[in-house]
A protein has these predicted regions:
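Short, charged juxtamembrane terminal tails flanking transmembrane helices
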Residues: 1, 131-142
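Alpha-helical membrane-inserting segments
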Residues: 12-17, 40, 44, 48, ...
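Membrane-interfacial segments
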Residues: 20, 24, 52, 127-136
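N-terminal signal-anchor transmembrane alpha-helix
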Residues: 1-38
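Alpha-helical membrane-associated segments of multi-pass integral membrane proteins
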Residues: 6, 86-134
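Canonical alpha-helical transmembrane segments
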Residues: 32-60
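Transmembrane alpha-helical segments of multi-pass membrane proteins
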Residues: 1-9, 55-74
Length: 142
């Protein structure tokens, strides 16, 4: 059930990104594209957690997030939305220059996205297993 709802969330997120990209500021873009999926995954994994959760649960959600990101990046590149976003927010002012990556599908962007999504899930998995081990150590037998 959680996986189905998560897939719907990422599908909706894809459509929101493709329709509202040009209304995002760069800070909002970073929050919605990189931070929101990590927080969403953490929330779902926290709700889903039961006695039989496994490492697989911590891989599936970042995979959905990654697929949504790649689909959005492809759509933004193919339609020219990303070029419009770049032209809106690339700034050159004297000594300072703010540049945005020419494509969301650049290798550096994809590696960063994977590190953020899977790194967040791996950190949560480590934290959850640490808590489980701590609970087992606290059990006293009479």
């Amino acid at each position: 059930m959680f996986l189905f709802l998560s897939a719907l969330f990422y599908l909706a997120l894809f459509f929101v990104h493709t329709h509202f990209l040009l209304t995002y500021s760069p800070l909002v873009f970073l929050g919605l594209v990189y931070l929101l999926p990590v927080l969403f995954n953490a929330g779902v994994l926290g709700l889903q957690r039961s006695k039989n959760w496994s490492f697989l649960s911590f891989v599936q959600l970042p995979t959905f997030a990654s697929m949504s990101y790649v689909a959005f990046a492809y759509q933004a590149d193919a339609t020219g939305l990303w070029e419009q976003f770049i032209s809106l927010y690339s700034i050159t002012d004297g000594d300072m220059t703010v540049e945005i990556a020419p494509s969301l599908l650049d290798m550096g962007q994809l590696v960063f996205m994977m590190l953020v999504y899977y790194g967040g899930a791996l950190a949560q998995y480590g934290w959850e297993t640490y808590k489980e081990r701590s609970k087992k150590k606290e059990v006293t037998y009479a």
